[in-house]
Design a protein with these regions (language model features):
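Hydrophobic small-molecule pocket/channel-lining residues, especially in calycin-type beta-barrels
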Residues: 1-194
Length: 194
């Protein structure tokens, strides 16, 4: 994996530097009560000099889905349909003074494991706090807190995985919602646009 650390990026978030940029690509949602549908996701990780990354993502239903997610896909040619959801928030490495906020190696020739906190808000009436780790070009997250407004859907827990594979950002989300147990909700692959 070769990349350049963006100018002005706070040292605290160097373990997340590989995410900085705009990513776009197809995926699928498949969950009880929702059914299966192709989606288009665009996610942006940016920095403003603070000890965090700014994060924004928009998900649309996909107008012209590829036959499958294998092989080359021209993500610029994908057409967004109706917006499905948006989310925004902050990805941060906890201060080293914080209890449990350790950066450690996981063994010889393994990238360091760095603890991570992610705070997200959605216009559907949800806010969530995820805790997890970044290890090289891989992120594992699980909700520590989920809150909703009186009209927000009942989502009780979620897990996310992000990984850089062959220069593409693979992602998957599992969730427990609508009385269902934790299970796969969505997944896809994103290509770096900037």
């Amino acid at each position: 994996m070769s990349f350049t650390i963006p100018e002005g990026l706070a040292p605290e978030v160097y373990p997340l530097a590989w995410l900085v940029g705009t990513w776009r690509g197809p995926g699928f949602i498949d969950y009880p009560g929702i059914g299966e549908r192709p989606i288009l996701v665009e996610a942006t990780f940016s920095a403003d000099g603070g000890p965090y990354l700014l994060y924004e993502a928009t998900t649309w239903e996909l107008e012209n889905p590829p036959a499958n997610l294998e092989g080359d896909i021209d993500v610029v040619a994908l057409t967004p349909g109706q917006m499905w959801t948006r989310e925004s928030g902050y990805w941060r490495v906890p201060p080293q003074e914080a209890p449990g906020a350790a950066t450690s190696t996981s063994g010889d020739d393994q990238p360091a494991r760095t603890e991570l906190e992610v705070l997200l808000a959605e216009p559907t009436g949800h806010v969530s706090v995820y805790l997890g780790v970044v290890q090289g070009p891989r992120v594992q997250l699980a909700t520590d807190l989920m809150a909703r407004t009186a009209t927000g859907a009942e989502i009780t827990a979620a897990q996310r995985m992000y990984g850089l594979v062959n220069s593409e950002l693979m992602w998957a989300t599992d969730m427990a919602a609508f009385g269902e147990e934790m299970q796969s909700y969505s997944s896809g692959r994103l290509q770096r646009q900037t």
